[in-house]
Amino acid sequence: MKHINLSFAACGFLGIYHLGAASALCRHGKKLVKDVKAFAGASAGSLVASVLLTAPEKIEECNQFTYKFAEEIRRQSFGAVTPGYDFMARLRSGMESILPPSAHELAQNRLHVSITNAKTRENHLVSTFSSREDLIKVLLASSFVPIYAGLKLVEYKGQKWVDGGLTNALPILPVGRTVTISPFSGRLDISPQDKGQLDLYVNIAKQDIMLSLANLVRLNQALFPPSKRKMESLYQCGFDDTVKFLLKENWFE
């Protein structure tokens, strides 16, 4: 098999779609996953990429954490920006419980996390991690949407960083083929296929997304999580869209 990479797009709480995709890859694309050279992602996409690489057996645990996290946000008077609610602390607690002690070693030079320098607004892809805490900090930085996730920016190596999805929402690696995964309909390998829309696309932070009403709804759901039933449906969509891709590429097993 030629050089294959997997890249998961930034998408907030639509990351449940990515978990459905990851579950399908583990169940029906084992040979593909085994041969993947590198994993990449931004924001929620980087979180799922890190789990698929370092702790694939914990995908179901991630699902349950995501459902509970979303329920917490829905219960807040003003969602994630409710005064007194610590979005980043909750996210960190999930990472602490899911990522294994050796996560940084497993991720070394194989996980590429998109982050944005708060001062220069330049994008960086980080792929070296000196410790588990180092990895967690980079993942937190990649997921930090200013104001929404809090006011205190994430510090890493003496600089302040924010959400990688603001500058590169879907990292494409320079070597080999990068299989792209996104819960937004667009020019992607694995994504929903919106029907009956004008064939118009907009490039948002290096991700080609179709101009459609469904994508506008998804954008809202990324920051304001929908009901658990809808999130379960999004998970199933991620699973089903990935199965279609595996069948089409003759990687299904």
Curated annotation (Swiss-Prot):
Main subcellular localization, coarse class?
mitochondrion
Q: Which residues form the PNPLA domain?
A: 6-176
Q: Please list the GO biological process terms of this entry.
A: lipid homeostasis; triglyceride catabolic process
Per the Swiss-Prot or TrEMBL annotation, the motif DGA/G is positioned at 163-165
Q: What CDD domains does the record tag this protein with?
A: Pat_PNPLA4
Tissue expression remark: Expressed in all tissues examined, including heart, brain, placenta, lung, liver, muscle, kidney, pancreas and spleen.
Which EC number(s) does the record attach to this protein? 3.1.1.3, 3.1.1.4
Which is one GO molecular function term here? phospholipase A2 activity
> Which Gene3D superfamilies does the record cross-reference, listed alphabetically?
Cytosolic phospholipase A2 catalytic domain (3.40.1090.10)
From the UniProt record, list the reaction(s) this protein catalyses. a triacylglycerol + H2O = a diacylglycerol + a fatty acid + H(+); a 1,2-diacyl-sn-glycero-3-phosphocholine + H2O = a 1-acyl-sn-glycero-3-phosphocholine + a fatty acid + H(+); an all-trans-retinyl ester + H2O = all-trans-retinol + a fatty acid + H(+); 2 a 1-acylglycerol = a 1,2-diacylglycerol + glycerol
A Pfam family of the record is Patatin
Q: How is its activity regulated?
A: The triglyceride lipase activity is inhibited by BEL ((E)-6-(bromomethylene)-3-(1-naphthalenyl)-2H-tetrahydropyran-2-one), a suicide substrate inhibitor.
Location(s), subcellular: Mitochondrion
Q: Would you name any one GO CC term?
A: lipid droplet
Motif GXSXG, residue range(s) on this chain: 41-45
**Active site as annotated:** S43 (nucleophile), D163 (proton acceptor)
N-terminal signal peptide: none
Which disorder is it connected to?
A: Defects in PNPLA4 may play a role in mitochondrial disorders characterized by complex IV deficiency.
- Could you tell me what this protein does? Has abundant triacylglycerol lipase activity. Transfers fatty acid from triglyceride to retinol, hydrolyzes retinylesters, and generates 1,3-diacylglycerol from triglycerides. Additionally possesses acylglycerol transacylase and phospholipase A2 activities.
User: Cross-referenced PANTHER family, in alphabetical order?
Assistant: CALCIUM-INDEPENDENT PHOSPHOLIPASE A2 IPLA2 -RELATED, PATATIN-LIKE PHOSPHOLIPASE DOMAIN-CONTAINING PROTEIN 4
Q: What is this protein called?
A: Patatin-like phospholipase domain-containing protein 4
The record lists the organism as Homo sapiens
